[in-house]
Amino acid sequence: MDHSMSKKLHDEALLHIVGGVNSPSRSNKGVGGGIPVTMERASGAYFYDVDGNKYIDYLAAFGPIITGHAHPHITEAITKAAQNGVLYGTPTKHEITFAKMLKEAIPSLEKVRFTNSGTEAVMTTIRVARAYTGRDKIIKFAGCYHGHFDLVLVEAGSGPSTLGIPDSAGVTKSTAEEVITVPFNDLASFKEALAVWSDQVAAVLVEPIVGNFGMVAPEDGFLEAVNELAHANGSLVIYDEVITAFRFMYGGAQNYLGVIPDLTAMGKIIGGGLPIGAYGGRIDIMEKVAPLGPAYQAGTHAGNPASILSGIACLEVLQEEGLYERFEKYGSMLKDGIEKAALKHGIAVTVNQIVGALTVYFTEDPVTNYAEAGATNGELFGRFFKGMLEEGINLAPSKYEAWFITSAHSEADILETIQAVDTVFGKMVQDN
């Protein structure tokens, strides 16, 4: 494929934008470098770049675009919002409608509040949990990404009984010491951390199904035990459902798994492609939020009509009968096709697939936590990513990211993708 215009634009972007991108995940650093493709437009399941190349898209903007690009129902809602004014700074009737839709879909959301992003939603749930419990420390799980605010840019110390250390320049040591990080799916480490820090732990923050070191499900009984132990300790449980809400069913991963948290943070899908976040939970906890309580949260753009109307339209599309069954069918088809191609060419892969989301790890071993994901072959994934791009398949440029199937993907798209995988695996073996 010709990418000359993408290269020209990236060279120009480097002169004006830090690193040439507005989020480091777009830089291709995770796949060994190379020029990121600049897209011109998107429609349905397809991307079209500035050089005229067409791609089947599984990036889905890192998750929000579950209905495909430029879905007509969502486009109509956004157009209506633009015509009537995109920002008021006052209440609107639409935010009531949307709040009711979220509550009906995820019953643990007894009250909700809108924010501008998933990062803001997670950040605020932690603040509210601290206000409710009067405690300061947070337990989180290694490799789970919760946004780019200081408190969650923290990695594990030497073990569950040690304090966290900064995972980014600019995060202070004192901030990192408010966080204890333990391995996902490791109940023994979680118990140890809870025992050591006990009455200092305000909340446990967890992705109920991990989406940020690939798609990783909780082991049987893990989330149930986390809930039970946290509550016995007087700590709250916060689910970060920024990736998972409405991903696996019309509702949250908590509905899908049958394990209910005290607070939930959401984003991505619920905006229909526009920036949004939301959080909610038990009434007695949510009443700690201003103006009813002492935990402050605000935002100029929070609940803006454009994002709210886009979100309403997105949820309306997701109510289509049989949609999530189709996601499951296509996800299973992809997993099966990738595994058969890998076996044919003698390439070791593990595919973690949950409904319409999956991750392809270059390893023969199961992946159930961040350390196991980190041990997979990134060099092979980088070659695979670039090979798939040349075959017209757009993936996320990191071995840790997921593929997302949208309502716009067809069975023909899935079959074409499987053929591309077979072709790329063949070339990878030949190149060796």
From Swiss-Prot:
The keyword Mitochondrion does not apply. The keyword Transmembrane helix does not apply. Its EC number is 5.4.3.8. InterPro entries: 4pyrrol_synth_GluAld_NH2Trfase, Aminotrans_3, Aminotrans_3_PPA_site, PyrdxlP-dep_Trfase, PyrdxlP-dep_Trfase_major, PyrdxlP-dep_Trfase_small. It is an enzyme of class 5 (isomerase). Belongs to the class-III pyridoxal-phosphate-dependent aminotransferase family. HemL subfamily. This is Glutamate-1-semialdehyde 2,1-aminomutase 2. One of its GO terms (molecular function) is pyridoxal phosphate binding. It comes from the Bacteria. One of its GO terms (cellular component) is cytoplasm. It catalyses: (S)-4-amino-5-oxopentanoate = 5-aminolevulinate. Pathway: Porphyrin-containing compound metabolism; protoporphyrin-IX biosynthesis; 5-aminolevulinate from L-glutamyl-tRNA(Glu): step 2/2. HAMAP family: HemL_aminotrans_3. Homodimer. Its cofactor is pyridoxal 5'-phosphate. PROSITE patterns: AA_TRANSFER_CLASS_3. One of its GO terms (biological process) is protoporphyrinogen IX biosynthetic process. It is found in: Cytoplasm.
